[in-house]
Amino acid sequence: MLLKLLQRQTYTCLSHRYGLYVCFVGVVVTIVSAFQFGEVVLEWSRDQYHVLFDSYRDNIAGKSFQNRLCLPMPIDVVYTWVNGTDLELLKELQQVREHMEEEQRAMRETLGKNTTEPTKKSEKQLECLLTHCIKVPMLVLDPPLPANCTLKDLPTLYPSFHAASDMFNVAKPKNPSTNVSVVVFDTTKDVEDAHAGPFKGGSKQMVWRAYLTTDKEAPGLVLMQGLAFLSGFPPTFKETSQLKTKLPEKLSSKIKLLRLYSEASVALLKLNNPKGFQELNKQTKKNMTIDGKELTISPAYLLWDLSAISQSKQDEDVSASRFEDNEELRYSLRSIERHAPWVRNIFIVTNGQIPSWLNLDNPRVTIVTHQDIFQNLSHLPTFSSPAIESHIHRIEGLSQKFIYLNDDVMFGKDVWPDDFYSHSKGQKVYLTWPVPNCAEGCPGSWIKDGYCDKACNNSACDWDGGDCSGNTAGNRFVAGGGGTGNIGAGQHWQFGGGINTISYCNQGCANSWLADKFCDQACNVLSCGFDAGDCGQDHFHELYKVTLLPNQTHYVVPKGEYLSYFSFANIARRGVEGTYSDNPIIRHASIANKWKTIHLIMHSGMNATTIYFNLTLQNANDEEFKIQIAVEVDTREAPKLNSTTQKAYESLVSPVTPLPQADVPFEDVPKEKRFPKIRRHDVNATGRFQEEVKIPRVNISLLPKEAQVRLSNLDLQLERGDITLKGYNLSKSALLRSFLGNSLDTKIKPQARTDETKGNLEVPQENPSHRRPHGFAGEHRSERWTAPAETVTVKGRDHALNPPPVLETNARLAQPTLGVTVSKENLSPLIVPPESHLPKEEESDRAEGNAVPVKELVPGRRLQQNYPGFLPWEKKKYFQDLLDEEESLKTQLAYFTDSKHTGRQLKDTFADSLRYVNKILNSKFGFTSRKVPAHMPHMIDRIVMQELQDMFPEEFDKTSFHKVRHSEDMQFAFSYFYYLMSAVQPLNISQVFHEVDTDQSGVLSDREIRTLATRIHDLPLSLQDLTGLEHMLINCSKMLPANITQLNNIPPTQEAYYDPNLPPVTKSLVTNCKPVTDKIHKAYKDKNKYRFEIMGEEEIAFKMIRTNVSHVVGQLDDIRKNPRKFVCLNDNIDHNHKDARTVKAVLRDFYESMFPIPSQFELPREYRNRFLHMHELQEWRAYRDKLKFWTHCVLATLIIFTIFSFFAEQIIALKRKIFPRRRIHKEASPDRIRV
């Protein structure tokens, strides 16, 4: 029926006049629609579908990386960025600085100090920029001194003004009815002391430094009638006396005093008569000259308030160019699109700023303001990078694991998630240089090591981690070495400076870095034994080699050798365990199984001693055997010859003592800016540079009384630690030279001498033996040392050598020394090239506190850089002077002392914050040596970061509160990674039970009980161990109540045991049986909560970009030649330098050469964003939405009105049809009668 109907309709359509055309068009439309539908389906399934539902394609590239990514784990990128050229930002910075200055002014007022005293940077900032403007020894007081106050009364009001030579009043230039007092001093030192001194009774009087200038156009000047400036004379005059002798007679007769200011090329004249200026001015116009140069006399104007004339300098201090960036964020985004296209979204955290080139329409990029992430909005605005970083994990919609970058960090090669994290090994942590010491001369490895170290015995180091509490702690070094010694009794021990020679074998290489399985470039030098084998064996020929032979236990290292290694290739295949006796001569000892060597690196300049080793080795058959060896060492150099002369004092002279001094390389500092200039000296026989400081040995009793007193004072200062040994030697040498005259300069011949003062004939000293003389290059020889057989017991603690694995032992060593033959190999003479020469290091006694200050030598690796933060004002240290001043004032408030005596010590806020966090971590996780994470992209887990902040809520809240970077900030990467590496997962007994319960039955069988016994007992397992465990379980089942053990719920036939008394071993029974849980806790150690892996520095390139063009070009070319995965170009350009523009052009050219293709996140070059602040954009969007809403309302009203106007009748008819009216029928009246 249906088919006939369809056939009839078809015939009807075809029989129609246009039926054929309609059918043709219908067929074409059907075919085209089919193709269109198929294309849409295909396109949807390939791209749109996968982008929306396929997690492998949910990234900025929109492509699948399934063949490279292990898991479809979404990873976002978070940037922190700021536009340093924003005028609103610069105003806010200036306001914060002024607020800090106000607070410090109030603190000075509390301390009774001068409220106008500038900080170190402020004084430089308020620079007088007028013509011939000089700072003179005068102070200006406002309000003025009392009218009856005389010069004699002045010290009673201001004790620090006792050196004043004159005083007078002058009228204020802007208010002539009021005066200010001017106090004159003779010298600059007197005026500085008076300006820095406290005021009696907390006076609020303003005290200013006075300036004189010839620029009469500046505001706030007062003409000085009796003073004048002389200029135009040759600049060769550097002393006042030189200029005074050259003055013409007409000029010199009219002046009282003359003071030359050579730095300004002017001289200040004090005239005899205030009216004499007009006469001098006329005379100078009549061609008054000095050496052909025409002189000029100018009036002198007094000023004191520099705020008006120095406004331009202040504006320059916070100018846009100072904080200008190089569009690093643009190129960093390009690097992500090129080398890390697998990231999902990009979040840019700003203070509300928007990059002018950023494409805000891209759905993959989002601007996040500080208001969106800060929990406490009262902490805003903030200008502290740690405060901002502590909140970035709170970004809404952020992935659990995200990568955090600064805008100056980019990728140089393809990067994948497993460069940051792998599921098998966990988080990859990239560490660089060690945390700065908690105190000067106290490395982190000394804290809580069982020895009380004087340098660490302070609150900053937690009293050496507890080593100095009580009387049980031992001192690190044995007695017998002193810094002074008996001068007349022969050559004494000389100690070097503390941290550089004890804790660091080379500049930037800590002893703890040796043999750590990473080749550290700073350690790959001779003085560090070439990183104890970590950097290969190419330079082993420069070390002293000793071959260990079977049946030999006594070895001797020649005198003066302190870099040696022992080869055990002839007696063993690998080292298993090793300990050595406690001896201060040892700097480092370790086993390198890869090279079959034992490395022994010692301190130079130490007395002869014997080191005992207890080694456990493996032979070729994997059989372990133990050997005990004794090594005699003496790292002192042989003393030089004495000599005699005929003069009285010359007979007291002894050989000179060389004091080496190393050149510290500053690779990133231009040569023209390196100061002081180091003078090169001759190279000695060992190829090292050394400076000859002659220290005469004299009989003290023959010197004058004055010399004896001064020498005793020097000895006392050295004993108290006021001066270092180097300073002691230099001072003593200079002192003796002043009494001995030039006799020390005569050439001293090596020969025997007779000490007539003592009447004893001294034996001539041997010539010092040079290390590896040229005559023995490549030569092999054998020598025999014989010692009497004796037993020596070492009472010091044993140190574990560190072959992998390291097994600790506390056994004491007792080994007889036997006479044996030692094979000595001298392979090549040591010739150190000048580029890598090293000092001869000498041992120092830390108990005396002779340490090199950390501020002078900050040890670090090749990548060590003091990275102050990502914000430009942190890089330029804009607030550093105020932070230093605040720290000083807080210290003075705490003790209420005079700052003149306490002084100010400039701080490094970044280093102080590292010490602060390190101290917190020590208190929570124990004392250990820590290193600073590299400045590179970091993968952060939001959950881990939240756990860290939950553990230290007050510390992070304090960090968030700080407006600028503070010394008590929680450093973001440092605190995060060391929490991740230090957090411990408590042992879960239930988890141990499930591991042993392999059949998952909930009850342990006999086999599973044996497995548990092997886990908690040492192997081989004895019958007593197994039965003891069973008895523990039986006893617990009898003592514990049934509701805890839940034995009644177990079917009796589920498990059958050999011991019929053993109940079903359920999880409840095991977890509640204390003897068993104690055994498990003893056998199972707490594991790290998070897995991690320490990585090297091979893929990190950190470059500090400064203003030296050639140096910058070399740095960038190094990146071009050796591309790394993680590249950081830290901008430290001096934008006021003449080469700053060139450096920025070179940097921009480098960026364009590396990443020339614009990314999807950029607008075309001819476009820029209309709004550069989020609040402007949000206001515009709110206005747009409101306008759109009202526009739609008006349009809807118009449409409705139009419809009603044209279709009114139809609408009414439709209404009547849909809603018909009901007709009302009137009822008939009941009174009406129907007829």
UniProtKB/Swiss-Prot annotation:
Binding site for Ca(2+): D449, D464, D467, D516, D531, D534, D997, D999, S1001, E1008
GO MF annotation, one: calcium ion binding
GO cellular component, one term: Golgi apparatus
Post-translational modifications: The alpha- and beta-subunits are generated by a proteolytic cleavage by MBTPS1 protease at the Lys-907-Asp-908 bond.
LNR repeats: 438-473, 505-545
Matches recorded under InterPro entries: DMAP1-bd (IPR010506), EF_Hand_1_Ca_BS (IPR018247), EF_hand_dom (IPR002048), GNPTAB_reg (IPR041536), Notch-like_dom_sf (IPR035993), Notch_dom (IPR000800), Stealth (IPR047141), Stealth_CR1 (IPR031358)
Ranges annotated as biased composition (Basic and acidic residues): 837-848
Reported consequences of knocking out the gene: Severe retinal degeneration, growth retardation and secretory cell lesions. Mice are smaller with a reduced mean body weight and length, along with a reduction in total tissue mass and lean body mass. They show elevated levels of serum lysosomal enzymes, cartilage defects, and display cytoplasmic alterations in secretory cells of several exocrine glands.
One of the GO BP terms on file: lysosome organization
Domain notes: The DMAP1-binding domain mediates substrate recognition. It specifically recognizes a conformation-dependent protein determinant present in acid hydrolases.
Protein name (Swiss-Prot/TrEMBL): N-acetylglucosamine-1-phosphotransferase subunits alpha/beta
Enzyme Commission (EC) number: 2.7.8.17
